[in-house]
């Protein structure tokens, strides 16, 4: 959400409300609590790739906001197809058990594209900073899905961080209307 807020300010001259900024900080605190245990080990390469992915996602939201007439379904379908074509070659489904394969197929074939379609459509009605507030909920949901599907019990920090994330997103998106700046982007 931080990158989406900054980029929408730079590219679209959209302001982010103080309430949304507070929610962003609180949400990021929850994410740090969730991943805090894994931050101590490993190299920086994975962190840099994750940071790059977050920045590309923010750029994506800003582009959707700037161009509300882009055909959402077509663009999401084309990008999903390209993603499939790029990843199908190196993938080896025989390395996954049946549950993992079904979960992967469900995510890539249904949940991922539907989520991207919803996100891209939401930018017609809300600034990228607010739309991106929903993405940290995916981190919480992923932990729950792994718990339900694979019986991998999340750490206590995951529950605490997840509660912080959900409460922060709820706080950021349910405030009084005067605290939300619904100003639409200026067309180029």
Q: For each of these PLM feature ranges, what is it?
A:
Residues 1, 35, 53-61, 83, ...:
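Transmembrane alpha-helical core positions of polytopic small-molecule transporters
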Residues 2-16, 58-70, 116-123, 173:
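C-terminal ends of transmembrane helices
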Residues 4-6, 39-94, 104, 183-188:
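Transmembrane alpha-helical segments that form core, pore/gating elements
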Residues 7, 16-36, 53-57, 81-87, ...:
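Hydrophobic transmembrane alpha-helices of multi-pass small-molecule transport proteins
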Residues 12-17, 71-72, 127-128, 150-154:
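A helix-boundary/kink motif common to multi-pass secondary transporters
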Residues 42-55, 98-112, 158-165:
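Structural signature of hydrophobic alpha-helical transmembrane segments
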Residues 64-82, 113-148:
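Helix-helix packing/entry segments at the starts of transmembrane helices
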Residues 124, 178-186:
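Short, Lys/Arg-enriched, Gly/Pro-containing loop segments at transmembrane-helix junctions
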């Amino acid at each position: 959400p931080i990158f989406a807020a900054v980029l929408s300010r730079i590219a679209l001259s959209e302001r982010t409300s103080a309430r949304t900024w507070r929610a962003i900080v609180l949400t990021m605190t929850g994410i740090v609590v969730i991943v805090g245990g894994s931050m101590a080990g490993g190299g920086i390469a994975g962190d840099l790739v994750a940071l790059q992915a977050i920045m590309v996602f923010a750029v994506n939201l800003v582009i959707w906001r700037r161009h509300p007439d882009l055909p959402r379904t077509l663009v999401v379908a084309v990008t999903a197809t390209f993603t499939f074509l790029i990843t199908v070659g190196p993938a080896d489904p025989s390395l996954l058990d049946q549950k993992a394969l079904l979960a992967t197929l469900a995510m890539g074939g249904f949940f991922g594209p539907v989520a991207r379609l919803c996100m891209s459509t939401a930018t017609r009605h809300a600034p990228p900073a607010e739309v991106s507030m929903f993405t940290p909920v995916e981190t919480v949901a992923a932990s729950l899905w792994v718990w339900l599907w694979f019986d991998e019990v999340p750490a206590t920090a995951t529950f605490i961080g997840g509660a912080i994330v959900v409460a922060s997103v709820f706080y950021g998106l349910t405030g009084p209307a005067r605290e939300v700046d619904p100003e639409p982007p200026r067309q180029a």
